[in-house]
Amino acid sequence: MQSKSWLRAGLFAALATAAFAASPARAQGSLVMYCGVQEEWCRAMSNAFEKETGIKVAMTRKSAGEIYAQLKAESSNPRGDIWWGGTGDPHLQAAEEGLTTEYESPMNKELHGWAIDQWKAAKHRSVGIYAGALGFGFNTEQIKAKGIPEPKCWADLLNPKLKDDVQVADPNSSGTAYNLLATVVQLMGEDKGFDYLKALHKNVSQYTKSGAAPAKAASLGETAVGIVFIHDAVVFAVQGDPIKPVAPCEGTGYEIGSMSIVKGARNLDNAKKFYDWALTPAAQALAAPAKSYQVPSNKASPVPAQSPKMDQMKLINYDFVKYGSSAERTRLLAKWDKEVKALPK
């Protein structure tokens, strides 16, 4: 990662006066929202926007890869208006394939550089709304019962005593899992990275559809380890569950969660209103009460106290342009399907 100053600055940010002010129930019309974060945060955002504007929001929650696939399937007859949340890689692929549309928000001037970098990489078709680091969470009771050291590194997840006791999502449906795939390739090199994923496959009990699901499974003791964005493990640690979040010792990748307007949106003006509103400190402050602890993109937005300290982690210089490209993402997913998922257990 080229600079972590944006993270340090965010730690001291205070909630600023919202740049968006709308009188409740005065606006008319509707908005179809595809949401790529946790259900509770999705509903907090859709309900708050509806209350402030009077615009009726029809929200559907899916993983980022699923939303990308839906936009592609609906491209000849778009049904959605705004895609809010989910890892930036599929947002970039959607932008490259013309599934989303250009927009420059007046809020751009208030955003961290990494959020604008995403906007530039997408040729103005997507923007960063939050950041989060990749890692895993382990169930402390299960690890103790197995009599093995607490895992601190990616390499530790290959321990034979963790056979069928690691969960991670499928990168075809999950932006989290694709981020893992791209991270391992960048961290280890493609050949060694795929060797790692093949070895990890022996310990994976289930490839889930949702990227955050393995964190919940680990918190409940349904699996010993869940590979997730670290903030998803923090959710359960904060509420007292026996799960410990880990930033892997070798280094790790991170996401720029993003937002895009669907090309051909039937409610384009309302999509732009939501886009502008979602970039305000007031809207971004809805994350923490919804148990979402990512680092927000507006410089004046409050950073949740529970947020993982990304400036203290060993982060790779994740190449969002390359790994968010249609050709590279398609190639890596096909290779993973053939060389990893198809392997016998």
Would you name each region that the model predicts?
Residues 20-27:
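Sec/Tat signal peptide C-region and signal peptidase I cleavage site
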Residues 28-93:
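Early extracytoplasmic/lumenal segment of secretory-pathway proteins
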Residues 36, 40-43, 79-222:
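Extracytoplasmic ligand-binding site segments that recognize negatively charged/polar headgroups
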Residues 89-93, 219, 224-242:
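A ligand-binding cleft/hinge motif common to bilobed small-molecule-binding domains
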Residues 101-110, 126, 155, 241-253, ...:
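Short beta-strand->loop
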Residues 137-142, 182, 256-267, 286-289:
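A bilobed periplasmic-binding-protein/Venus flytrap-type ligand-binding module shared by bacterial periplasmic
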Residues 196-201, 207-208, 239-263, 299:
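Periplasmic-binding protein-like
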Residues 262-320:
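Mature extracytoplasmic/periplasmic domains
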